C-alpha cells in the first residue's frame, strides 16, 4: 500500500466531507461519487488496502466510539428489536440471498451464495444515525438503529467465517456452526468485559488525562485482536469493552471524559471518510476484476441489481413482521389487563413499588409505530463491514484452487453497498421529513425534570452542609450568593466571580464541591434505574464543561 496515496485519499475525503456539510449534503454519498470520478483520472493507481487493515484498524474504533456513547441501559431497553434486526434479520438475509443467487447463476454453489449473503447482510448505521440526529428522529428509533449496528456486524462476520471455512476447507474451533456461533458470541463478550474492567482499574491509578485517553485508544484494538486470536467475535469484544468502560466512565476526571469525546469524534470523521472514499475509488477496478475473471460483466451487475432489490425488500418485510408481533402482544396485554382483576392488581402493586422507589412508570408493550417502522425498514445502507468482508475472501482454498466466485461476490458486494447508499441514503432524509414522526420532546422534558429533581436535592444537601458549617473565608453574602446559584442548577457558576481574590478562590472550591455532588447523586440514581440514561449523559457533559471552567479559573490563580 502506498502511504503517500493513502494520505492523499484521506485529505481529499476530509475536504469533500467539509464541503458536503457546508452545503447541507450527505458526506458519504458525495465522497463515493467523487471517489468514483477520481478513479477515472489517467494515472490514478488502485488503492490496495488489505482486509486486515479495514477489519482490524478501521472497524474497532468505529464500533467502540458508537458503543461508548450508547449505554448498556439503552441496549437492554431495546433488546428485543436489536437482537431481531441484528441477528435474526442478518441470518434471514444471508439465507435468502444465498438461495436467490444460487438459483440465478448457473454453477454457483449454495455455500458460495450464502457467503455472498453474509457479506451483504449487515447494514451500517453510520449514515442513518447521522441523518437521524440531524432531523431529530425519536430517541427509540435512534437507539434501535445504533444497537442493531453494534450486533449485526458480529453476526455477519461469524456467518462469513463459517461459510469461508466450509468452502476453503480451513480449520475452525467447532465443526457445528451453532456451537461456533455461540462460542464466538459468549467468549467475545467475556473478553470485552474483562479488558474493559482491567482498563477501568488502570485508569484509576494513572490519574492523568493524557495517559487515560491513550489507554482508551488502545483498548478497542486490544479487544478485537485478542478475541480474534481466541477465534471469538472481535466485534462483540469491542462492543462489550466499550460498555464496561462507558458504564464506569464517570469514575475518571472531567478532563478525560471531555478529551476522549473529542478524540473519538475525530476518529469517526476520519475513518468514515476513508471508508466511503475507498468504496468510490474501488468501483472502476472491481469492474476490471470481473472482466479479468472472464465473467460476463452484464450478468454480474444484473445479479448485483437483483440482490440489491432483495436486501431492500427483506428488511421491510422483517421490520413489519416485528411491528405486527409487537402490536399483537400489546393487544393481548391490554385484553388480559381488561379481563383479569388479579392481573390488574399485580400491575398496580408493581407500579406502586416503582413509585415508592422513585422509578419512572414502566411502559409495557410499546411497539414501534408505523412511521417508525417505515424509517427503520428504509435505514439499510451497507458500508464498512460489507466492503471489508468482500476484500477478506481468500484467493484460494487449502487445496490450492482459486476460491470459487470471489470476483463475483466482490462485484455484487460493491453494487449492493453503493446502491443502498445512493437509493436509501439519498432518500432517507426526505422520507423522514414526509412522515413527520411525532417528537418525543414531552418524554425528554419529563426525563429532564426527574434529573433536575435529583440535582436540586444534591444542591440542597451541599448548601445545608455549608450553611451549618461554613468554610473559612465565606462571608454571609457569599453564602447567599452560592445558594442562589445552586438553585439555578449551577448554570451561571462557571461565569461567577467572587468579590476578591481570596473569597473567589474559596467560592470556586465550593462550586467544585457542588458540581461533584450533583454528578454523584445523578449517577447513583441512574444506576438504580430511576433516571433516563440519555438525560443523565446530557447533564454529565454539561457538568464536565462547567467543572472545566471553574477548575481552569482556580489554576490561573496559582
Labelled PLM ranges:
Residues 1-446, 461, 469, 526-558:
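Transmembrane helical cores of multi-pass secondary ion antiporters/exchangers
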